[in-house]
Amino acid sequence: MSFLKSFPPPGPTEGLRHQQPDTEAVLNGKGLGTGTLYIAESRLSWLDGSGLGFSLEYPTISLHAVSRDPNAYPQEHLYVMVNAKFGEESKELVADEEEDSDDDVEPISEFRFVPGDKSALEAMFTAMCECQALHPDPEDEDSDDYDGEEYDVEAHEQGQGDIPTFYTYEEGLSHLTAEGQATLERLEGMLSQSVSSQYNMAGVRTEDSIRDYEDGMEVDTTPTVAGQFEDADVDH
């Protein structure tokens, strides 16, 4: 296929974790031949006997797994999903994007690496996990960042910057607008009604239910209703 290129295999300088010879490469159901799979820290590469092959960058790999389902593929293999198109499909994708620029569907390619030695699959998968972990998704890292304003203690000690304002509960109430106070009262009423409804049986509030919620503590003293949840046999 046209995307196959000639390049030197990854070496020790690229953190080679696993090398698996006699491995067939399959792209979207089309066999590419048998060659050697190189799982390195820098990239995932496959080369056939003539020195032609391809490399996959870890940030483009969205999924990898060991597949043993004969319904998905007749042989056990290492499955790799990539967010990209290759070969003739990449040309078709470019043409489709020119016709419909509003299409947000992300391109997907499926690689299957079928080793001659099926016992090597676990080692291949482990090496993939270790190398993939070295290339975290930058979007995941950004989501962990704190978006709020940070109080600069050092700047405050130097007489710069504003001191953050903190309110007690009573002080906070005094800063509420009329609309805010009305909302707070409505929420408190809903909460009170919700607590009350939890301790009513058949719409009747009993004395036991009142005592069980004294001082804000729930105490389970409700008597068991005979026969309602019992599985024992009863003689008649």
Swiss-Prot record:
It holds the Pfam family Voldacs. Widely distributed but expressed more abundantly in nonpigmented ciliary epithelial cells than in pigmented ones. It comes from the Eukaryota. Its main location: cytoplasm. Keywords: Acetylation, Cytoplasm, Cytoskeleton, mRNA processing, mRNA splicing, Nucleus, Phosphoprotein. InterPro entries: ICln, ICln/Lot5/Saf5, PH-like_dom_sf. The keyword Ubl conjugation does not apply. The modification Phosphoserine is found at residues 101, 143, 192, 194, 197, 209. Involved in both the assembly of spliceosomal snRNPs and the methylation of Sm proteins. Chaperone that regulates the assembly of spliceosomal U1, U2, U4 and U5 small nuclear ribonucleoproteins (snRNPs), the building blocks of the spliceosome, and thereby plays an important role in the splicing of cellular pre-mRNAs. Most spliceosomal snRNPs contain a common set of Sm proteins SNRPB, SNRPD1, SNRPD2, SNRPD3, SNRPE, SNRPF and SNRPG that assemble in a heptameric protein ring on the Sm site of the small nuclear RNA to form the core snRNP (Sm core). This is Methylosome subunit pICln. The gene is CLNS1A.
